[in-house]
Amino acid sequence: MARKRNENSLAENRKARHDYFVEEAMEAGLVLVGTEVKSIRNGRVNLKDCYADIYNGEIFVKNMHISPYEQGNIFNVDPLRERKLLLHRDEIRRLDGLVSRDGYTLIPLSLYLKDGKVKVALGVCKGKKNYDKRDSMLEKAHKRDMDRAIKEKNKY
């Protein structure tokens, strides 16, 4: 059975939890221009290969693809442009300290609406090795089999 999608969830980076260990997640605002919000509300956003970097005390998301809005004409911007994240200075410093450790990076996990504003769930992640991915897939399969067996047993 497919997972129910949250009503105010706009996009989700499903590969992030497969490719990375998510150590910590936090909410950040996103600076958008013009018709990007309309395009995001239509679900025309891709988080698959995006990541965040810290420059001069500011965090920017790279490779987040927001398709141009069809009725946007001259107000459309570059779909892959860098977008600034809105966080407090002390939060940025703390994230900078976490990411400076070897192997850690900032990955956007999902986009959602909160009080009419687009927010990003930003995760501090460490990359998985291939054997970690296989182990997590096996754990998922075992859990699914156990749930199926319990459901069958409780059926009668």
UniProtKB/Swiss-Prot annotation:
Pfam families: SmpB. Belongs to the SmpB family. Signal peptide: none annotated. It is found in: Cytoplasm. PROSITE patterns: SSRP (PS01317). GO terms for cellular component: cytosol. This is SsrA-binding protein. Gene3D superfamilies: 2.40.280.10. It comes from the Bacteria. Keywords: Cytoplasm, RNA-binding. The keyword Metal-binding does not apply. One of its GO terms (molecular function) is RNA binding. PANTHER family: SSRA-BINDING PROTEIN (PTHR30308:SF2), TMRNA-BINDING COMPONENT OF TRANS-TRANSLATION TAGGING COMPLEX (PTHR30308). It comes from Clostridium beijerinckii (strain ATCC 51743 / NCIMB 8052) (Clostridium acetobutylicum). NCBIfam families: PRK05422.1 (NF003843), smpB (TIGR00086). Its main location: cytoplasm. Required for rescue of stalled ribosomes mediated by trans-translation. Binds to transfer-messenger RNA (tmRNA), required for stable association of tmRNA with ribosomes. tmRNA and SmpB together mimic tRNA shape, replacing the anticodon stem-loop with SmpB. tmRNA is encoded by the ssrA gene; the 2 termini fold to resemble tRNA(Ala) and it encodes a 'tag peptide', a short internal open reading frame. During trans-translation Ala-aminoacylated tmRNA acts like a tRNA, entering the A-site of stalled ribosomes, displacing the stalled mRNA.
